[in-house]
Design a protein with these regions (language model features):
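Hydrophobic transmembrane alpha-helices and their immediate loop junctions
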Residues: 1-310
Length: 310
């Protein structure tokens, strides 16, 4: 194994396509800023955050008055910072282990949050469970470190407006961290009466992305962590967790988890084999416990009522 790792470290690194990374980042900044501008306008006017029928008219207003985009930057910069921290966590873990990897690719999209997220491309094999664990866990932890203060700042700038959370076309669930932080900052205020500031909404999206990535399934970050601990039992355990995810969707009535579980099962749950099957060690077990806590704090059985996607 040492000779294989030496060969990997001596192989020339792939060239980064800086222009493509920069272009995708700028486009994603634009799409998320447009979304943020709408969120800010609705927040200022005490209108529900998402009114689907109002989208086209607002986009025309931005076309006529581009300065409206400035108000969307708090949302977009917060969201992109969380996503960037997550992907750089993976990237730096790869760098530490001399694994060739790309810089983050951002994905602009005409969705309710303006993006499909971001990813890095790992261009070299991962040889050991320790490496796999480090690469898998670094992203969610790095993103969570940025997410927590963003959530605090966003909640501090949120406001109480009776019944606002139940109005509009979409109703958002409360992950455990958001619920606890709300009780701390707004004691006695019902969740339905709290109007989240756009920064808090960006943190909410970060929580959902973190929860999804940490699911112990397939080749998600949580799936990498699962393989690092259980090796060749990974596929069977992934199948079990995918079925559990579908069951959560059935029990709580959210089609999204059922669709995600079906997607995971349909695309296959195999994981590339690892050469070095040595245990990850006690220290990494503690880090895995931290990742499990982050998953518990980020997950919500019904992320969005009224939609199965963002």
């Amino acid at each position: 194994m040492e000779s294989a790792m030496d060969a990997r470290s001596q192989r020339p690194r792939s060239r980064q396509r800086w222009w493509l990374h920069a272009l995708l980042l700028v486009l994603t900044l634009l799409t998320t800023t447009i979304v943020g501008s709408r969120l800010d306008a609705n927040f200022a006017a005490n209108r529900p955050a998402f009114l689907i029928d109002d989208d086209f008219g607002f986009f025309l207003a931005i076309w006529d008055q581009p300065r409206l985009l400035i108000a969307g930057l708090p949302f977009s910069l917060t969201l992109l910072s969380i996503l960037l921290a997550h992907e750089l966590g993976h990237f730096w873990a790869c760098q530490f282990h001399r694994i060739d990897a790309s810089l983050p690719y951002f994905l602009p999209a005409p969705t309710l949050i303006g993006t499909f997220g971001a990813f890095i491309k790992i261009r070299a094999p991962i040889f050991s469970r320790r490496e796999l664990f480090d690469v898998g866990v670094a992203g969610p932890i790095a993103g969570f470190i940025f997410l927590v203060p963003a959530l605090g700042i966003g909640l501090a700038n949120s406001k109480v407006l009776p019944g606002i959370a139940e109005q509009g076309d979409l109703v958002f669930g409360s992950p455990l961290l958001l619920w606890a932080a709300t009780k701390l900052i707004f004691p006695g205020v019902a969740a339905a009466d709290l109007y989240l500031h756009p920064i808090a909404r960006a943190a909410w999206v970060g929580l959902l992305a973190t929860a999804l990535n940490l699911l112990p399934i397939g080749q998600l970050d949580g799936g990498h962590i699962l393989y690092a601990f259980f090796g060749r039992q990974h596929r069977r355990l992934s199948q079990i967790f995918a079925i559990v995810l579908a069951a959560i969707g059935v029990i709580f009535g959210w089609l999204g988890w059922i669709l995600w579980a079906g997607f995971f099962l349909w695309t296959g749950l195999r994981h590339p084999p690892i050469i070095d099957e040595s245990p990850v060690g006690t220290g990494r077990m503690r880090v895995a416990a931290v990742a499990l806590v982050i998953l518990a704090l980020s997950f919500t059985p019904v992320p969005v009522r009224g939609s199965v996607y963002l």
